[in-house]
């Protein structure tokens, strides 16, 4: 569930993902408890480290490419993505403009996975697009293991 702790709890979601402008990670962890998944967005090494210290289970980082879902998001440089990945011990998930044509550009960045919206929901065959992205994501992660 994105950004709404209350709705996540009410609907029995497995967890919640929040941005930097939402309530603090420690406060969210106290509300949702230790068994729910907590993801926190980070755009800097400092934010990523703070998110991990606040009890995040994973860090969302991006936009890594130009994206249609967040027009104001400036794409992140791969080197910053690598520094963020190296600064925390929890998984880092890249988001923003990721599709089958660019996902492998993230190889070697240290990210543990990707979050994708438009490349699946905008596809003619969403199931096929998701399967292709899953395979490419595995290749991307394997490239830096």
Regions found by a protein language model. Name each.
Residues 1, 17, 40, 113, ...:
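Conserved SAM-binding loop
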Residues 1, 20-43, 72-100, 133-144:
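Alpha-helix-loop-beta-strand connector modules within alpha/beta enzyme cores
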Residues 1-2, 59-61, 94, 116:
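Short beta-strand segments at enzyme active-site cores
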Residues 5-10, 25-26, 45-53, 78, ...:
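Amphipathic, non-transmembrane alpha-helical secondary structure
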Residues 10-18, 37, 41-86:
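Glycine/Thr-rich beta-alpha phosphate-binding loop at enzyme active sites
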Residues 13-15, 90, 111:
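Structural loop-to-beta junction motif characteristic of Rossmann-like glycosyltransferase folds
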Residues 20-30, 60-72, 100-136:
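Glycine-rich phosphate-binding active-site loops on the catalytic face of alpha/beta enzymes
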Residues 48-51, 56, 94, 111, ...:
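Small-residue (primarily alanine) positions within well-ordered alpha-helices
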């Amino acid at each position: 569930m994105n950004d709404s702790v209350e709705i996540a709890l009410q609907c029995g979601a497995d967890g919640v993902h929040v941005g930097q402008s939402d309530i603090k990670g420690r406060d969210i962890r106290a509300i949702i408890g230790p068994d729910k998944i907590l993801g926190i967005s980070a755009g800097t090494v400092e934010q990523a480290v703070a998110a991990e210290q606040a009890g995040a289970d994973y860090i969302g980082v991006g936009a890594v490419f130009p994206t249609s879902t967040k027009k104001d998001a400036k794409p992140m440089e791969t080197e910053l993505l690598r520094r963020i990945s190296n600064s925390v011990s929890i998984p880092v998930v890249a988001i923003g403009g990721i599709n089958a044509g660019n996902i492998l550009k993230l190889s070697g960045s240290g990210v543990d996975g990707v979050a994708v919206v438009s490349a699946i929901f905008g596809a003619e065959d969403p199931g096929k697009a998701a399967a292709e992205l899953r395979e490419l994501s595995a290749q991307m992660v394997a490239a830096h293991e």
